[in-house]
Amino acid sequence: MLLGVITLFPDMFQSIVRYGIVGRAIRRGILSIKLWNPRLFTYDRHHSVDARPYGGGPGMLMMIEPLRNAINQAKDELGNNIKVIYLSPQGRKLKQKYVYKLAYDHQKLILVCGRYQGIDERLIQTEIDEEWSIGDYILSGGELAAMVLIDTISRVLPGVLGNQDSKESDSFSKERLDCPHYTRPETFDGMKVPSVLLSGNHDEIHRWKQKQALGRTWIKRPDLLNYIQLTNEEKNLLSEFKNEYLLSLNKKTRK
């Protein structure tokens, strides 16, 4: 997969391309990332990339020409069939199912990172195919959002993760949270690993993990359950979890 990034701060991406999952994807030849700085596509002596907004208002806006020139250069180098994405708080909120779609439906993406108060609306109208947001909060620029998108796309590309099951069991991979996980030591400060995980009974372990994942979703992100079509078995597991959870709460209040 080819990813192009339009950014005023290309050095910010040096760590993500060298380490972790993204670095592994690049070393294995599964992912390639190229960076273009709009400042290199300016023609005035100050290399201006921002200006005051018409109509007044606080802050500065990124100018259309340097951005468009950088995008055009990226398109020339990356080739045809490219989707251009603007990381923006006005964009559609990113979810795991959309990550799969972006990763599997497109071999080439260009990510445009805004700065200041944003970018000239005319660029959005003429050059941007989609706007995506990573959440309802404000960042200083689109670079961190682009890194989030790059990382999450890298995880779902075939051959990147050492264990294919890892991405399938991740939180949100099936529109639900992941189950709790435990490792050594078996007992820590009096807290023990659930006995079922030590039993060796794979069917019971699988059942426990399913129930805990559904229960954790119900407790922490109940909104996600509105989008899940539960099987009868999953409904029973969730009902069991609720009963056990409420029973444990009653015991705590009695103490």
Swiss-Prot record:
Catalysed reaction, written as an equation: guanosine(37) in tRNA + S-adenosyl-L-methionine = N(1)-methylguanosine(37) in tRNA + S-adenosyl-L-homocysteine + H(+)
Record flagged with keyword Transferase: yes
Cellular location(s): Cytoplasm
Record has Transferase as a keyword: yes
Record EC number: 2.1.1.228
InterPro entries named among the record's database cross-references: Alpha/beta_knot_MTases, tRNA_m1G_MeTrfase_C_sf, tRNA_m1G_MeTrfase_TrmD, tRNA_m1G_MTases_N, tRNA_MeTrfase_TRMD/TRM10
Gene Ontology CC, one term: cytosol
Disulfide bonds, paired cysteine numbers: none
Top enzyme category: transferase
Any GO MF annotation of the entry: tRNA (guanine(37)-N1)-methyltransferase activity
Residue positions binding S-adenosyl-L-methionine: G114, I134, G135, D136, Y137, I138, L139
Pfam families named among the record's database cross-references: tRNA_m1G_MT (PF01746)
GO aspect biological process, one term: tRNA N1-guanine methylation
Keywords: Cytoplasm, Methyltransferase, S-adenosyl-L-methionine, Transferase, tRNA processing
Chief localization: cytoplasm
Gene3D superfamilies registered for this protein in UniProt: 3.40.1280.10, tRNA(m1g37)methyltransferase, domain 2
NCBIfam families: PRK00026.1, trmD
Annotated family: Belongs to the RNA methyltransferase TrmD family.
Main function: Specifically methylates guanosine-37 in various tRNAs.
Assembly notes: Homodimer.
Name of the protein in its database record: tRNA (guanine-N(1)-)-methyltransferase
The organism of origin for this protein: Blochmanniella pennsylvanica (strain BPEN)
